[in-house]
Structure formats: C-alpha cells, structure tokens
Amino acid sequence: MSKKDSKNSPKKSKDTNSDESSSSNAETSSDKSITYLKLRDDSKTEIKYIYHMSDIHIRKLQRHDEYKEVFDRTYKILKSEITSNDSIIVLTGDIMHMKTEMSPEIIDITSNFFKTLNEIAPVILIPGNHDCNLSNKNRLDALSPIIENTYKFPDLFYLKKSGLYQFYNIVFGVTSVFEDDLVTADKITKEHWNKIKQPNKFKIALYHGPVHNAKTDVGYRMNNEQLLAEDFKGYHYVMLGDIHRFQYMNENKTIAYSGSLIQQSYGESLHGHGILKWSLVEKSSELIEVRNDYGYCTVKIIDGQMIETKIPKKPRVRFILENTNQIQYQEVINNLEKQYLIQEIVKESNLKTKYNNSSPSKKDKPTAYATQETMVNSYMEKRGLDEKTTKGIIELHKKIYQKILANNKEKVVDVMHNSTKTQKWRLLELRFSNALSYGKDNVIDFRNYDPNKIIGIFAPNHYGKSAVLDIILFCLFDKCSRGDRRDILNKNEKNMSCSILLSIGSQQYYIERIGVRNKNGLTVKIDVNFYSITTNEKGKETMTKLNGLDKNETNRKIAELIGDYNDYLTTCFSLQTKNSNFIDMTQLQKKEYLNDILKLNVFEECHNYAKDKLKDLTGQLKVLEQKIGQKSLDDFKSSVRKITEEMSVINSEIKWIGNNLLPQVDIVINKNPVVPRIYYNELLDYDLTDVKSIIRTQTNILKQLSDKQNNNEIGTISVEITSKKQQLNEISTKFDEEKIKLETQLGELRTNKENLLKKLIKIPKINSDEIETHKKTVQECEDRINIIDKVFEEHENDELTDKMSRIDELKALISRLRKSLAVTNNNDYSHLDKLYEELINVDTKYRQCISNVLNPKKILNQQEKNHLSEIVKIKRYFTDNLIDNNGLLGDYDKGKSNLNDELIEKIMSKNNQIIDQENEWFEQADEYLKQDNSGIIDVDDIIKQRSKIQEQIRKILLNILNKKENQIIESKINKAQTELDALAEFTGTKKEIDNLVQEKKLLKDKIVFLKEKISQNELAVQNQKSNDEIKKQINEIESKIDQITCIIKDNTSEINTLKQYISEKESIIKKHQKQIDQTNKLNHHYKLLDKYYLEYTNWNHKNSTREKWLKTRTEMNDKLNDLNKNLDKKQVELDMFKKEVEQYIESRKEFDDKSTEVNLYQHYVQIMNCNGLPYEMLKTYLPLIESDVNEILHSMVNFNIEFMFYDDSKLEEQKTKQLKSNMGSVDINICYHNMKPYNVQLASGFERFIIGLAIRMTLCQISLTSKPNFLIIDEGWSCLDSDNLSNVGTIMNYIKTQYEHVIIISHLDELKSQADYIISIDKVKGYSRIIENKKTIKKIINKKPNKIIEL
C-alpha cells in the first residue's frame, strides 16, 4: 500500500541484541540521516537460511483455536528444519488483525507466538499497516507493548524504523510503514559493506506494502507505479509482506511475497499458505505449506450434484448453485455435515439459477441487455393471448414506440434495438471561490492524481470537508444536498464562482456558475455558462458556448450530457446526511430508479401514451354505444313487426266501430225522445231533485208525524213534575238543618288551624350539607392545629428535616385525587320521595291496565299475546335496573353520614317493595300467557311516564353516590393541602413561628365560632321536627274542612239539578198545542209526495236512457278519433325505425371497429404497466445485479443477498423458505448460513452500509446513463466495528479497481491510513482553503544517498 508523507522525526525504539553486540538507543537528528545499526556480528557466523512469514492477522477473539493448531504445526516444521545457528526467521508485518483494539487473549497468543519462535531461532520483525495507526504516528503501535513488557526476547529484533540493520553476514534495508523514504540498496556504503568479514554476505530488503503489478488474493493487479520491483535494484533478495498471495515479482525469483500464513477469506486459495524458505547461498527458495484443518473453500453444485472439491476437516464453505433447487441444496449440506465439522456456510446463486436453465448443457447464457423486441414477443405468448391479438399488440407497440422515440429523442433511449447513449465522463479540475465556508481561489486538479487511487479529504470538524461534495453537485446540477441554492454563497461575501472541467472521450466540457448577492442581501442571482472545448492541430483551444435560451434549458442540456442529480446520489455520491441508499427506497422508487438507470423508461412513456389514447378511444366508444343503444338489429326488426301488427289491429277496430256500432246507437237514441218534467207548488219548499231526495223528504215527514203523535206523554210529564217538586222540598228542608251544623263545625276547624299556625316556629333555612361542611371545617382546623403543634415540637427539638420531598409527595397526591373527582350537580333531592310516590301511583295504574288486559273470560289472539309479551320484557328491563341500583347502593360504605344512611335504606326499601310487586305480576302474567288468556290495552303512555320517573331516580342516586365519594376525596385533598400549606409556609425562622402561633389562635377562634353555628343548626333541626308535627295536625284539619265543604257542595248540586229538570218539563207542556197544527199539514204533503214520486220515476227513466246512449255515442266518437291518431303515430314510428335501422347498421360497424381498437389498447396498457413487461424485463437484470453485488460482498463479509421477485418456477423454493413473494415488488433478503433469510430492512447498520455500497457500485457499473469516473464516500464507515474495519484495506483495493478516483471523507484512523493522496483543508482568517498533498515513495527513489549514522 502507498504511504503518506511524514514530517515527524523518528522516535526512540528499543532493539534487543545478542551477546555479540550491545544494546543501543538511537535517534536520528535529520530527515536525510539513515540509521545503520549492528544487531549482532562475530565476523564468523553466517546466516544461510531465512524462514519468511507474513500477514498472520491474529484476531481479537475469533479463530484462536484454528490459529493455535496452525502455530503448533508451524513450530514443528521450523524445529525440524532449523538444526543449527545458520537460520533466522523473518516476519514482514501484519501480525495483528486490528491495530487499535486489543484483548487479553490476543496478547497471550501473540506473546506465546513470539516466545516460541524466539526459542527456535532469532527473529527479525518489522511492523505492518495492521500493526499500527498510520494516521496518527504519535500513537503507540500494537507490537511494542507485547515485545517490551510481556517477556524478555533475547533473539527477537523489532525493526520499527527505516534504516540499515546488520545481522551477522546480512544487511537488512528496512523501509518502515511509519516513514515514506524507500531505503534503496545504494544507501549501503562500501565502508560498511567491506567491514563484514564473512565470505558470504547479502543485502536483503524488508518492506510491507504493495508493489506495482502485484496480484491480490481476489485476482486484482496492484496499480502502484510509484513503487516498482526494479526500485529494489542492488538487493540480493527482497522479502515483502501485505499481499496475501504467494508470488514472485521478478523472473529471478529474488523478490517475493510469502503470502498469508493462514487463509483469511474465500478470496484466497485454500492452498499456498505457509513459510517461504530462502536458501541464500544456493539462491533458491521454496514454499513450505502448513496444513490447516479449517480453511475457506468454494463448492459448486450444478444440476443438484456437487462438483468434487477438496475440503478440509473443519471448513467454511461457500456454495455456488447452478440449476439447483432448495431441496437438492439441503441434501448436499446434510451429506457434508455428516463428513465435516462445517464452521460456516455461504450460499450464492449464479446467473443460470436465476434464469432457471434446465441443465448446464445450455451454453447460451442470457445476456443482461438482450434485444427487448424479442422479450415483447415472448411476454405476449406467456400471457396466453391469441395470435391475432399478439400480432396486433406488437404492431401497435412499434407504432407507439416510434412515435415516442421521434418526439423524445433526448429523453428516451432506443432500448428496443440496444442503441444506448451510455458514456463515461472524467472529472479533470474543480475551481471555486467564496463557496460555502471557502474563500477565494481554491483548486483541485484531479489530473495530478494517478488513476485507481484513494484520495482522502481530511480536516477537523467545521472546516468544510463535506462542502467540497456539495460544491461539485452544485456546479454540475445547480443544487446541493444541504440548504437552499442561495446558501452556496459565503455569508460574508457578495459574489462567488465555481467551475468544473470534464471530458467525455477526447471532448472536453466546461461548466461555470457565477453567483451575485442582490442589494437586499436576501437572494442570490446565479448564472450558468456551458462550453465545449476543442483543440486544433496547433494545440490552440477554442471554447464554444452551449447555453440554451434560458438557465433552465442550459441545465437540461448539462443533465442530458452527464445524467440526473438523484441518480448520482444513489450511485457515486454517498453523502453523510442524505445517503440515498437503494435499500431505503420504497418499492415504487426502486422500480422507477432501476427503470431510469437501465433506460426502461421508454416503456413508461409508451404506457402513458397508450393510457391517454385509451381514454380518448373509450370516450369515442361510449358515444357510439349511446348511438346504437342497447338494441340489436333483431330488436329493430321485432319492433317494426310489432308496430305493423298493432296498426292492423287499430284499422280493424276503426272499421268495426264506424260501420257497426255507431249506426245501432243512433237508432236507439231516435226511439227515446225528450219528455217534459211536472212540478207541484205545495212541494216547492222541499228538495226533490232526484229519487233519493224524494225518499229522504218522505222519511223526514214521517218522523215528524211520529213525534207529533206522542200527546199521551204530556200527562205523564205532569205527574213527574209534581213528584220532583215534592222531592225538592224534602231535600231542601233536610239540607237547611244540616248546613247550620256543618258551617258551625267548619268554623271551629278553621279556628283550630289558625291557632296551630301561630304555634309554628320561624327558623332559618337549614342545609344539612352546611352542617357537615362546618363539622369538616372544624376537623380540618383541628388537623391544622395538630400539624402546627408538630412543627413546634420538631422545631423545639431541633430535628426539622428537609420538607421538600414531603411537599412533592403531597402535590402528587392532590393531583391524583383531583383527577379522580366525579362530575355532579347541586340539585335539591328533597323531591326524591315524591318521585317514588309517583312511581308507585304509575305502577298502580299500570297494574290496573294490565288487570283489564288479563281478563280470564277472554281468549288471547296472537296479536294480543305478542303485545303482552312485549309488556313483560319492558317491565323486566326496569325491574332489572332497580335490582342493579340496589346493588350499587349496597356497595356504599355506611357509617359516614347518618342522613345518607337513612336515605339509602329508605330508597332500597322502596325499591325492594316495587321489585316484590313486579315479581307477583310476572307470575300472574306467565300464568295468563300459558292459558292463552289475554286482553287488549294501550299502556304506551304509562310505560313512557314510568321510564322517565325511573331514569330521574337513577340519576339522583348516581349523583348522591358521586357526591359522597367526592366528599371523601375532597376531605383527603383538604387534609393534604393543609399539610402542604404548613410545609410550604414554614421556613424555620422566628417570624414564621410567630405567624404559626397567630394562625393557631385564629383557628381556635374559628372552631369556637363554627361549633356555635353547629349548635344553632342542631337546635333548628329540633324546631323543624316540632313544626313538622304541627303541620301534620294542620293537614288533618284541612282534610276535614275539605270533607265538609264537599258535602255542602254535593247537596247544593243535587237541589239545582232537580230545579232544572222541573223547568224543562214545564216548557214541553207549553209547546204541545203547536204540534197539532203542524201534524195536519205534514199529512197533506206526504200524500202529495206519493203521487209526485210515481211521475218523477217515469220521467227519469226515459230521460236517463236517452242520456246513456248519447254518452255512448260520444265515447265511441272519441275512441274513433283516438284510434285514428294512434294509427298516424304508429306510422310515424314505423318510418323512424326504418331510418334508425339504416343508422344502426352504420354505427354498429364503426362501434365494432372501435371496440377492437379499445380492446387492443387495454391489453397494451396492462402489458406496459410497471408490473407488466417493464417488470419482467427488470427481472432479467436483477440476477446480474445480485451476482455482481455478491461478488463484491464476498470480499468483505460472510453473507450474501438475494433479490426476491415473482416467478412461477420459484414458488416451491419460496414455500420452503416460508417467504411471500409480491409480483409488484423488488425485495432484498440477507442470507447467512443456518439462518432463514431476512429482509434487508431488518439489517444492522454495518450490513446496510456494506450492502448499500455494493449495490451502489453495481448500479453505477450497469447503469445505461452517463456515469463519472469517481466514487465519493462521506463519513459512511462509522458503523463498522473493529473486526470489520480490519477488512477496509481489502475493500479499498477492490473499489480502486472500479473507479479512477475514490474520494473518502472520514475521521476514522483506519480510513485515513488507506489514502494514497491527501487533500488537506486549512482555515485562514475564518475562510477554508484547499491544500493539496501529493508525495509518494516514487519521488524519494531518485534522491541522492542520505547520510548514514552508524551505531
């Protein structure tokens, strides 16, 4: 890996030497000084063999059992190989896996590793990037504490700094990860070289980092032109670390990576891990593999059969499935679990599985971007449409597609024939002034940075790291992720500018935006310029302005060239605040976004066009449907036939009436001429208009004659008058005698009443609640006095404590009690007895009505029986309510108030009385119902009245209970409030004590006053009882007075009735003489009426017969006219139907044609729906996306993902997984071994970030839109823990292969150490400023040899 610049001087490091040399501490004083240190030398001993190991990666807690087994085998190999003192062990870094996190276990296993190796042979050790925090070189590395403080390692030499180190016949040129200067072979001077006396002496370079063209474990070639294998020229051997793959870097095989001792991931091969043995004298080397029973292995399962693969005893297995279902896959796992102790399982499906190929014999692998025209045809066939419809839809699609393509050439890509406009543009230069927190003249020239490198932007908080991203977005799209557009201008400046130089192929473009703050300071005017830059043969550049008519059109042109703002946020811009992650999108957003980047939006345009066209066609079809109506051609023919038949019937009827009926009627009329009517003068006063009136007149005369003949009744009337007068005299005489006695008795009673009224005592209005209130107030005053006494007692004993906690408790108690108060009213309940009396009276009436109904002599009909049953139900409902009320009253806590207790007992007693009466009635009613006996009575009014009274009683009782409960609660509130007031007012001072003394005195006075009031009220209560007794006597007297008054009134009424009867009879006798005269006259009129009746009957018969036939003739003429009119109307209808038939035939043909077209468009709209053909096409891309995403994930994590979508062939697999598919959705599941897949929405922060990053990179790769050459990640790594952070190097190495520039912004030290280049930000006078750093190892190579300091 490339290193960052360092201006710090090397720090002290302690090195351990053998007995032949002494220990030394060294410190270089100049950057140009090179340390030369003799570790051990006796001028005789020669080192002939070096056992080279690297990249151990001991983890904090994981895989320790595996490491111990491998270490034990390593020790055995080394002990068998090393039998003399001519061998050493070299460790080239990355002993630890996590540089900043340690544990007791990792210290134990590491120190034991060093100790055992040191006992076998001398050890030369250099640090790796995983052993130290390179972003903060002042921090202690992870190895020093173990080497210096755990054990004494006499033969372990930790070469932490760059320099030259002599060990017997070897000079090691160490280039440390802490420094950037490459220690080349020419740094070893002849003077030092000649001092080595051994005949075989060697220059060996030790370096931990990537060398150009080194191949990583995942197959990626390192692009690090700053450090080539040729730069180690002059060394006999170069021993490298950092790359986990064993490989030689030159043809002579003198430069090599030993690879990782233990396999680290699935990307590494199962074999090729161990110790690289260098034979220095023989100039050869060989890899001694160390067996590992664990290991990562990849197994393919094709057509349900596992391809033979070498598997260790305790493997971590990654399965790649081809044409294999879940059942077959599970069978393979079950078989392997019987043979091996599987540690981990990762499942991955390749493209063949996604496309459901039947066997691997199908070599034609489906491409991601197949011709969509073929898919249109196959989708039609899949929907089961007939050949004619399919052909019509395909022709319609071609027509619509060509029209969409012609109208929207700039917006829609020709995906039908794979004519895409995909292009990749390169960011060359960014310039900006006074943008956000920055000042003037800031430049980032990306042409200065080598491709496939990590560019880090590092600075303290609030320096503007993330602002660089917003400036790039603003310059490209005229918008940024934070704030408003006007906020892009620095708040302290009046103008700003930013520009981007980019290229597409050889063509360069220049985008410039200039902002000026308006005079009011509230708005900012921003202009945009867009240029293309061409270079002629002489190298002269020419800028051509590409601006549109206005700013919006210019922005559209830029977007057409480089793409959409939202696409960039989802692919190459990972922002800190608005991280538009694909997995966070809704289902609709996912499909819309994929359609957009894959240029499937043409189908949405086709769908919208067809949908609008369908609306127009549907409207036209409705108009045609209204024209043809609901009738068919047969209906029209039937109507014509029906009208013709009706016209024939009408003609026949006209002929029959005119030719036959009318002549016969005229003959009858002529035979009945008009006859004159006869009248009598004596009868002119009577109403004789018709036969009924004549008979009625005769009847009246007979009745009058009958009344006149009652003359014999006059004598009877005279006798009755004499008898009644005698009776009147007797009653009057008797009443006169009794009246005197009664009036005397009445006077005495009135006198007694007046005397009793005088005895009544006038008392003030008494309120029982007021007495209780006074008593409660007295109790509260006494409680308050007790509290004050308690306070005095506490104060006198100097034992007062903090009252605040008690105050809080009291406040909380008061609040709870107040919330529990029920709502009541202050109505007077004295009329409760009256309500119960009214209820009893109503029940009495009710029973009387029912008793009338329950008549045993009458048999019930069904209606009467139903009515009685309804009455029983109603009465039972009210009886049940009374029982419930008694239950509530029974729950009342008695003993608190005698008045309430008496009232409740009284109410319950009356309720029980009513309930007993009702139960008796129910028994009687049941008997009558069983005997089918009933009566009919209307009791609705009584029931309503009874219900109203019971509801009033219920409300009163409920209100009484609520009031009593409220009184108890209010008492508790007052008590707590009294204590609270005392605590709140008390401060412990003398003044407050005096106030309490005064308060106590006032309270005592108040108690005396209230007790007097209570005594007065109790006396008033006694007087009230005396008054009640007197009133009772007065009521008895008034009752007797009413009885006497009633007797007098009854006798007087009887006398008046007799007098009236005598008067009426006497007037009857006076009228008797007139009756005789009237009787004679009535007899004459009656005889004359008999004669007139016969004459009138004869006249009326003749006349009515003529009128009847005249009316018949008129009716026939009218009917004849109606028939003629109806005949004309039918003729008009017949003519209209003929025209309608002609129009119908024309409209029907047009309707059928239009209906076929509408049906075609309906199918087309359904097919082009977002869940139709576009979704089917999208499913062809999803396996590719899934495969690419999993390929990225496997280099970082131990899980993979799967895209879930509806597919008939996958239903069985979905059932096995117990998952639900949705045709209209694109779901993502996370898959771990031995775990059911779960939705990514349930994933952890780390899982979501890694999956989002992998999807982001994959979408950027397959996008059919324009894409840039860079990826920007702003603070996205904070969710990684220590174990996952250790894989950052691997992740970065992979990302660099995909993008020309990877820009990272982070505060994590692990991320800072990954940067190949650093863009620093400084602040000058409150303005941020860009500072570019670009120092690499390559620059140091060509320097002159530095000064050597020998130790």
From Swiss-Prot:
Residues 1-17 have a biased composition (Basic and acidic residues). InterPro entries: Calcineurin-like_PHP_ApaH, Metallo-depent_PP-like, P-loop_NTPase, Rad50/SbcC_AAA. Residues 1-31 are annotated as: Disordered. Gene3D superfamilies: 3.60.21.10, P-loop containing nucleotide triphosphate hydrolases. PANTHER family: ABC TRANSPORTER ABCH.3. This is Uncharacterized protein R555. It comes from the Viruses. Residues 19-31 have a biased composition (Low complexity). GO terms for biological process: double-strand break repair. It holds the Pfam family Metallophos. GO terms for molecular function: ATP hydrolysis activity. It comes from Acanthamoeba polyphaga mimivirus.
